[in-house]
């Protein structure tokens, strides 16, 4: 009997990550902003990257390596921005906030869709629109706390 009980506690468990159903009460749209800025930066780098002459195998390999790295970072950061926005939307904002921000759901929905677009496309327009959407969410978030926190970007 003891062995069965012990076995039930030592099995393979999937690791769950969360922010934060404790609830910790620590929320800030800055993490979404930083991720969106990184995705925008990678989008610009991808668009600026010049393909080498196809006859130079070493330069072509370096180009593909750099392009792949930029794409991976862009996709990771767009996904991270989406995760952070969804946390704010579903964990921080409450029905009472809809009175003050009637467009809250639409704003977050559009921002989440932009995260997906930035992830799968190389669109300077969508990457910029995502940062603009997060700026709007930043304003709502800090207004909901009756605080005036200036918007800024790190880049």
What are these regions (language model features)?
Residues 84-101:
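Short, solvent-exposed, charged loop/turn and helix-capping segments
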Residues 1-67, 102-136, 140-155:
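N-terminal intrinsically disordered, cationic/polar leader segments
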Residues 65-77:
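Alpha-helical scaffold segments that form or flank carboxylate-/histidine-based iron centers
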Residues 74-82, 86:
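Heme-based O2/NO sensor domains and their adjacent alpha-helical segments
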Residues 7-8, 79, 96:
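A generic short-segment signal for beta-strand/edge and adjacent turn/coil regions
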């Amino acid at each position: 009997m003891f062995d069965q009980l012990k076995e039930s506690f030592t099995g393979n468990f999937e690791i769950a990550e969360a922010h934060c159903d404790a609830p910790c009460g620590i929320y800030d749209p800055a993490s979404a902003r930083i991720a969106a800025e990184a995705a925008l930066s990678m989008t610009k780098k991808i668009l600026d990257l010049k393909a080498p002459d196809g006859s130079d195998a070493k330069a072509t390999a370096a180009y593909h390596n750099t392009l792949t790295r930029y794409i991976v970072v862009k996709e990771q950061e767009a996904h991270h921005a989406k995760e952070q926005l969804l946390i704010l939307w579903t964990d921080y904002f409450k029905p009472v906030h809809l009175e003050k921000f009637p467009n809250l759901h639409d704003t977050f929905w559009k921002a989440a869709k932009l995260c997906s677009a930035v992830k799968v496309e190389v669109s300077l327009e969508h990457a910029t629109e995502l940062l603009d959407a997060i700026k709007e969410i930043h304003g709502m978030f800090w207004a909901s706390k009756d605080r005036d926190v200036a918007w800024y970007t790190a880049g």
